[in-house]
Amino acid sequence: MAQHTVYFPDAFLTQMREAMPSTLSFDDFLAACQRPLRRSIRVNTLKTSVADFLQLTAPYGWTLTPIPWCEEGFWIERDNEDALPLGSTAEHLSGLFYIQEASSMLPVAALFADGNAPQRVMDVAAAPGSKTTQIAARMNNEGAILANEFSASRVKVLHANISRCGISNVALTHFDGRVFGAAVPEMFDAILLDAPCSGEGVVRKDPDALKNWSPESNQEIAATQRELIDSAFHALRPGGTLVYSTCTLNREENEAVCLWLKETYPDAVEFLPLGDLFPGANKALTEEGFLHVFPQIYDCEGFFVARLRKTQAIPALPTPKYKVGNFPFSPVKDREAGQIRQAAASVGLNWDENLRLWQRDKELWLFPVGIEALIGKVRFSRLGIKLAETHNKGYRWQHEAVIALASPDNVNAFELTPQEAEEWYRGRDVYPQAAPVADDVLVTFQHQPIGLAKRIGSRLKNSYPRELVRDGKLFTGNA
């Protein structure tokens, strides 16, 4: 594999020599950093099983190597890497897999270790959505996830990825993560804090990642991380699990942050060792039981993961003074909800008791029941999934609801050819050789729902959202 030239500040190299265990080779570290990163994907088990995915993609000649800590994760090699971007494959467009770096699958593996089955989870720094979607798959779309993102520009990307993967149990917020400890104390069974960091572990992906690196900036970042983990720990219920992770390598932003939390709340913090998380985990194990993953150990990005339990309650933070504002939605009455459910079922949309109908003007939404306890405590950017808009003749079903709720076995499902599916993703109407009978048509490809069309004569009118429309070469190879 070709090498690339990585910029290493001298002070960084000195710090790494001190931080690296004697069992590891510093020369191996430097060599690993200069090898391009292996690509990896995670199968979205909300949409397909690993076995079915492997069978579906077998004709492509992809080499898929299992990732030890994530049974649905694979390193991927393709002979035609330059011919078609992974993101333009049919399987990616329909949400069957997520392009995710292997080491970033570790925190969620740690969150659900030992059979942990949390019902209300927070992802404090969620964009672009790799870990939120991984959490949702582990929860099988049950319970509720609060996915927060501080950067306004990244919230849209977060929602797009959640929607593409067919996820229905997520509420999005846009806050500084330091507010949650005061705003929603002891409300979560599990919390993932994949903290903003100096990014020392990502040099294999970005050779210039350390251009602005300095020991002083590490200390400033660590100060913010301490505030974030303190807030997250307050938001965690007693008995709950907190996973703290970064994609950096210095101890200041990793072990020291976790040790600070234990020193601050000595009777409430229990470190949960990760040496048995997967075969070979002990190669990265620290004396505290954390995983400090240098890139040469597993040939992946540098990463850090710690898992801890909150053993008892801690003194509450001052109640926040901000006002959340009026919640603009109201629950739909049972009788009307039954009518809506029946109408939705006629086009193949079904949901279970984990979701409840709410209304805002002419909009119908499905919110995860587990998030209702947070209403009035935080302001949501987006909650659950938009099911439909009402109009004089009935309902205008929404694309994200189709992707999350539709069954491809519905009587009105219509399977597209590869060429027709590609036209669909380009936002164009489809003219099948034999048009379906129904007026509302659930269009599928590879037996996966990809949208809802109106039949007008022999034409299927495209309803694919404009912001998702794709240009350029797609999976049939035609531009």
Curated annotation (Swiss-Prot):
Pfam family, one: Methyltr_RsmF_N
Name of the top EC class for this enzyme: transferase
Subcellular location: Cytoplasm
UniProt GO MF annotations: RNA binding; rRNA (cytosine-C5-)-methyltransferase activity
Positions that bind S-adenosyl-L-methionine: A125, A126, A127, P128, G129, S130, K131, E149, D176, D194
InterPro entries: Methyltr_RsmF_N, MeTrfase_RsmB-F_NOP2_cat, MeTrfase_RsmB-F_NOP2_dom, Nol1_Nop2_Fmu_2, Nop2p, RCMT, rRNA_ssu_MeTfrase_F, RsmB/NOL1/NOP2-like_CS
Organism: Escherichia coli O81 (strain ED1a)
The EC number(s) this enzyme carries: 2.1.1.178
UniProt xrefs under Gene3D superfamilies: 3.10.450.720, Vaccinia Virus protein VP39
Similarity-based family: Belongs to the class I-like SAM-binding methyltransferase superfamily. RsmB/NOP family.
Annotated protein name in UniProt: Ribosomal RNA small subunit methyltransferase F
Main location as per UniProt: cytoplasm
Active-site residue list: C247
GO BP: rRNA base methylation
GO CC aspect terms: cytoplasm
Role description: Specifically methylates the cytosine at position 1407 (m5C1407) of 16S rRNA.
Catalytic activity: cytidine(1407) in 16S rRNA + S-adenosyl-L-methionine = 5-methylcytidine(1407) in 16S rRNA + S-adenosyl-L-homocysteine + H(+)
Record keywords: Cytoplasm, Methyltransferase, RNA-binding, rRNA processing, S-adenosyl-L-methionine, Transferase
